[in-house]
Amino acid sequence: MKIAIDGMGGDNAPVAVIDGAIQALKAYDDIQLYITGPEEVLNIELAKYTYPKEKVIVVDAKEVISPNEHPVMALRKKKNSSIVKALNLVKEGICDAVVSGGSTGAFLAGCTLIIGRIKGIERPALAPIMPGRRGKFMIVDVGANVDCKPSFLVQFAKMGKIYYQKVFNVKNPTIGLINIGEEEEKGNELTKAAFKLLKEESSINFKGNIEPREIPTGDTNILVSDGFVGNTALKMYEGSASSILGIIKDEVLKSSIISKIGVVLLKPVLKNIMKKFDYKEYGGAPFLGVDGICIKAHGSSDARAFKNSIKQTKIFYDNNVLKDIRNEFSSEN
């Protein structure tokens, strides 16, 4: 498997990107990495590691697109940027997948404009895997489409179903619509219309509306929403998990000696909880609906997070998710 890596994508690039890439090479002997970015900068970082030289190809890209640039304008202006070069490697069939921790707007726009959508897909959607109390779940969409039509959400559900089935080996995953109440008539015009369409779609296991307080349970495998609601839910979830863990740490520091001894005994449990809610464990989020394997890593990813983003890419590839989504929507046209 050949993977294009945006070597300059992310707050900690290129150091964390290269470190994570080398970790991935050690973990998976069937991958080859094409890393894009300024050749001299990448080679300096690569020189710090021992690795099979034939497994890494540096693709020179002198420009970098920053998060504060207008996505589409930057893509058109900076043809020699690390993101554009990485995306073109997939478009040209040189690589099987692409990973970037760079500008979310530029990456998602580039995936759509350069690689293109799968035939029949109205809008691609960003779909991260999240930790829940009783299992992992995914939210589709978390920011690629702020404004949606009801039909978009049905496609999000169908793409999410295919991904979840293949990756987690769940035959008929449950699907819910994020809304302000469980009743069918609750919500705005979008959610009311989407509810009706989702309920009528016989190919999915639709549970109904899911209130935000139910999201962390993980009882529902796939949650669909427009990108505005999904992104808000995602960031609130991440922030809440971080805050709760922070409160626990603060209380431990203020507690008595006996309480601290108890915490020491619970340390393995607390460590497992912290690991479960660490985004670095889950790597990047797949951009479902584009005609290629595109994984968006968190902008603040460290080496472990980049390594796990490459792992997500390999899982997507090994399970033929792209082929199955293509087949699903080609049969509808």
Curated annotation (Swiss-Prot):
The keyword Zinc-finger does not apply. Its EC number is 2.3.1.274. The keyword rRNA-binding does not apply. Pathway: Lipid metabolism; phospholipid metabolism. One of its GO terms (biological process) is fatty acid biosynthetic process. It catalyses: a fatty acyl-[ACP] + phosphate = an acyl phosphate + holo-[ACP]. Belongs to the PlsX family. NCBIfam families: plsX. This is Phosphate acyltransferase. It comes from Clostridium beijerinckii (strain ATCC 51743 / NCIMB 8052) (Clostridium acetobutylicum).
